[in-house]
C-alpha cells in the first residue's frame, strides 16, 4: 500500500520539510509515503476565496490516482485515538487500495474534496496551521505503523 499526502502549499518552512521527511523516510518500502504539493491560490484583500478553494480542490482531486481511498482531514471528521488509527491503517492495508490524505490550505478543503472523500479524519478539535498538520499526520501514521508492527517507537 502507498500513502499519499496531498497538501495545499509549496513553500514550507525548513522545519516542516525536515519534520515531514524524518517520518517519511522511516516508513518501510512496502508502505511508501509520498507528498504531493498543490500550489496555493493567490490570496489578497479582494481575493475570491470560493474560486480559490474550487481551483485548489480541482488540482488536489486531479493529483489522486483513480481508485485510491480518499481521506479528508477536516474538523467534522472522526477523531481517532492512536490505537484506533493503527486499526484504521491496518484496515486500509487489508483493503488493498492506496490511500490519499487531503490537507487543505488556510481556508480548509474545497467542498468537492470533502464530497469525494471516503472518510474524514479530524486530527484535532484545535485549529492548526496547515504546515504543522503535515508533520503531525506523518508522525501519527508512523506511530500507527509502529504499533501494527510491534516496533518499539510507540510506548503505552
From Swiss-Prot:
CDD domains given for it? RlmH-like
Q: Which InterPro entries match?
A: Alpha/beta_knot_MTases (IPR029028), RlmH-like (IPR003742), tRNA_m1G_MTases_N (IPR029026)
Gene Ontology terms for molecular function: rRNA (pseudouridine-N3-)-methyltransferase activity
Q: Which reaction does it catalyse?
A: pseudouridine(1915) in 23S rRNA + S-adenosyl-L-methionine = N(3)-methylpseudouridine(1915) in 23S rRNA + S-adenosyl-L-homocysteine + H(+)
Give the UniProt subcellular location, in the record's own words.
Answer: Cytoplasm
- One GO cellular component term: cytoplasm
Swiss-Prot/TrEMBL keywords: Cytoplasm, Methyltransferase, rRNA processing, S-adenosyl-L-methionine, Transferase
**EC main group:** transferase
* Binding residues annotated for S-adenosyl-L-methionine, in chain numbering: 73, 104, 123-128
- Domain of life here? Bacteria
* Coiled coil regions in record: none
The enzyme's E.C. designation: 2.1.1.177
PANTHER family, from UniProt? Answer: METHYLTRANSFERASE, RIBOSOMAL RNA LARGE SUBUNIT METHYLTRANSFERASE H
Q: Which family does it belong to?
A: Belongs to the RNA methyltransferase RlmH family.
- Please give the subunit comment from the record: Homodimer.
Q: What is this protein called?
A: Ribosomal RNA large subunit methyltransferase H
The organism is Shewanella loihica (strain ATCC BAA-1088 / PV-4)
Amino acid at each position: 500500500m502507498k500513502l499519499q499526502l496531498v497538501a495545499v502549499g509549496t513553500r514550507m518552512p525548513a522545519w516542516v520539510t525536515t519534520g515531514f521527511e524524518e517520518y517519511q523516510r522511516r516508513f518501510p518500502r512496502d508502505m511508501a509515503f509520498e507528498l504531493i504539493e498543490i500550489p496555493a491560490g493567490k490570496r489578497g484583500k479582494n481575493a475570491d476565496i470560493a474560486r480559490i478553494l474550487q481551483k485548489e480542490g480541482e488540482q488536489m482531486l486531479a493529483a489522486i490516482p483513480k481508485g485510491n481511498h480518499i481521506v479528508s482531514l477536516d474538523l467534522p471528521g472522526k477523531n481517532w485515538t492512536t490505537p484506533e488509527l493503527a486499526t484504521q491503517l491496518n484496515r486500509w492495508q487489508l483493503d488493498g487500495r492506496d490511500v490519499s490524505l487531503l490537507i487543505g490550505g488556510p481556508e480548509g478543503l474545497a467542498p468537492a474534496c470533502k464530497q469525494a472523500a471516503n472518510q474524514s479524519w479530524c486530527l484535532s478539535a484545535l485549529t492548526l496551521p496547515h504546515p504543522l498538520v503535515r508533520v503531525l499526520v506523518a508522525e501519527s501514521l508512523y506511530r500507527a505503523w509502529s504499533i501494527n508492527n510491534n516496533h518499539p517507537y510507540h510506548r503505552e
